[in-house]
């Protein structure tokens, strides 16, 4: 799938589903589930690298894990889920030339067909515009932006009028720049609904209500494997408890055998 194909999903009122992945096994599970998008998110910092936030993740980490994810795909590159890679902290806030270089490394050295970038500050918009002109598709990300948690925290965004209106303006700006879709994270449902109505490109929600054109979830959260479960993601199984008990049973049985 190509990024440009997602617009057809919105026109046809076809829900877009995205899952995160971080290695070959999770990539295989995400792709075989039928997800339209497999996102190698910088959330892998917490999911598999043991960090407390996304900030320590490097460009090399993202390239390494994106390649691992793609090796789990069963279909040909032209047919499999759209593979998107997060640009980690300080790889696109460091000037246009460096951002193009780093995004280019992701696209050239992995099977990712797009990058995701958080925020819409003027400097970030300049970078997004440049990347798109250079032929690199960009997925936007507004609302709660984890890379900005030192300034904004991890709380719900858009609750005050000023923030509410800014997120709406930023969404329109990102569409105008050429983003093929926008992730809306942890914002009021009404705000997400208004943005979805205003935009021609699809919105993909996570903790943003039911009116987005699609939904994305961190796979580890869905499977109940995360240490801290976000309030907007109900696990489909208590994976940590289930697999923990099964492993204990096996260890016990092996010791007694």
UniProtKB/Swiss-Prot annotation:
GO BP of this protein: pantothenate biosynthetic process
GO cellular component, one term: cytoplasm
Organism: Prochlorococcus marinus (strain MIT 9515)
EC category: transferase
Family in the record: Belongs to the PanB family.
Positions that bind Mg(2+): 42, 86, 118
Protein name: 3-methyl-2-oxobutanoate hydroxymethyltransferase
Taxonomic superkingdom: Bacteria
Active site, per annotation: 185
PANTHER family the record matches: 3-METHYL-2-OXOBUTANOATE HYDROXYMETHYLTRANSFERASE
Sorted UniProt keywords: Cytoplasm, Magnesium, Metal-binding, Pantothenate biosynthesis, Transferase
Gene3D superfamilies: Phosphoenolpyruvate-binding domains (3.20.20.60)
Cofactor: Mg(2+)
Keyword Chloroplast attached: no
Localisation: Cytoplasm
E.C. number: 2.1.2.11
Pathway named in the protein's UniProt entry: Cofactor biosynthesis; (R)-pantothenate biosynthesis; (R)-pantoate from 3-methyl-2-oxobutanoate: step 1/2
Gene name per UniProt: panB
Task performed by this protein: Catalyzes the reversible reaction in which hydroxymethyl group from 5,10-methylenetetrahydrofolate is transferred onto alpha-ketoisovalerate to form ketopantoate.
UniProt: 3-methyl-2-oxobutanoate binding residues: 42-43, 86, 116
Any one GO MF annotation of this record: magnesium ion binding
Subunit structure as annotated in this protein's UniProt entry: Homodecamer; pentamer of dimers.
Chief place of localization: cytoplasm
């Amino acid at each position: 799938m190509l990024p440009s194909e997602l617009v057809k999903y919105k026109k046809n009122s076809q829900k877009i589903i995205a899952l995160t992945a971080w290695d070959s096994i999770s990539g295989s599970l995400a792709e075989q589930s039928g997800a339209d998008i497999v996102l190698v998110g910088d959330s892998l910092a917490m999911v598999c690298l043991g960090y407390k936030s996304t900030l320590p993740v490097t460009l090399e980490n993202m390239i390494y894990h994106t390649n691992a994810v793609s090796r789990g795909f069963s279909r040909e590159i032209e047919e499999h889920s759209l593979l998107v890679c997060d640009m980690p902290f300080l790889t696109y806030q460091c000037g246009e030339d460096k951002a193009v270089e780093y995004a280019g490394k992701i696209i050239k050295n992995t099977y990712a067909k797009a990058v995701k970038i958080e925020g819409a500050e003027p400097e970030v918009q300049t970078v997004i515009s440049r990347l798109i002109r250079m032929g690199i598709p960009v997925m936007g990300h507004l609302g709660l932006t984890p890379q900005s948690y030192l300034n904004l925290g991890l709380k719900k965004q858009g609750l005050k009028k000023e923030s509410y209106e800014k997120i709406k303006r930023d969404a329109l700006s990102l569409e105008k720049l050429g983003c093929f879709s926008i992730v809306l994270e942890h914002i009021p449902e009404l705000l997400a609904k208004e943005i979805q109505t205003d935009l021609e490109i699809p919105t993909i929600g996570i903790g943003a209500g039911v009116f987005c054109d699609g939904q994305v979830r961190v796979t580890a959260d869905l499977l109940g494997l995360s240490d801290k479960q976000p309030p907007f993601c109900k696990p489909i199984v208590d994976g940590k408890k289930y697999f923990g008990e099964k492993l204990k049973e096996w260890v016990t049985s092996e010791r007694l055998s």
